[in-house]
Amino acid sequence: MRFYHRDELIDVIRSADLYVHPAEFEIEAIACLEAISCGRTPLIADAPRSATRFFALTDRNLFRANDPRDLAEKMDWWLEHPDEREACAQRYAGYARQFDFDRCMDEMERMLTDTTGAKRHVP
């Protein structure tokens, strides 16, 4: 096991057919966001203490936490249906755009200026 630089990590993610997110505890879901931004269809554990489960667009993107059989069945389905997997990846790519850093910062600035009544700085 090793750490990857960002460019290396993107290459690793893009080389995968699916992205599996088995975390039982997570708040930010950054790894999942990176994977879907790279065009990977995610399989996400439905762990009750993981916010990432809320990124599942369909039931096929969720598997029962700590249930390797359910995970294997979901993986097999996605691997046996490449057209559906690609369509799902495209939906996720569009979905991930709302979490783009620059877009989020623009929204945060808009929220703060609306709340304070200040004028928005437009470069």
Where are these regions (language model features)?
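A charged, aromatic-enriched C-terminal amphipathic alpha-helix characteristic of glycosyltransferases
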Residues: 80-113
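A short alpha->beta transition loop at the rim of the catalytic pocket in nucleotide-sugar-dependent
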Residues: 17, 39
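Aromatic "clamp/platform" in nucleotide-sugar-dependent glycosyltransferases that forms part
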Residues: 24
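Short alpha-helical segment that forms part of, or immediately flanks, the ligand-binding pocket
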Residues: 10, 28, 33-37, 51-53
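Short hydrophobic beta-strand element within catalytic cores of glycosyltransferases
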Residues: 41-46
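Conserved acidic donor-binding segment of nucleotide-sugar-dependent glycosyltransferases
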Residues: 57-68, 77-82
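Short alpha-helical donor nucleotide-sugar binding micro-motif in glycosyltransferases
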Residues: 4, 11-16
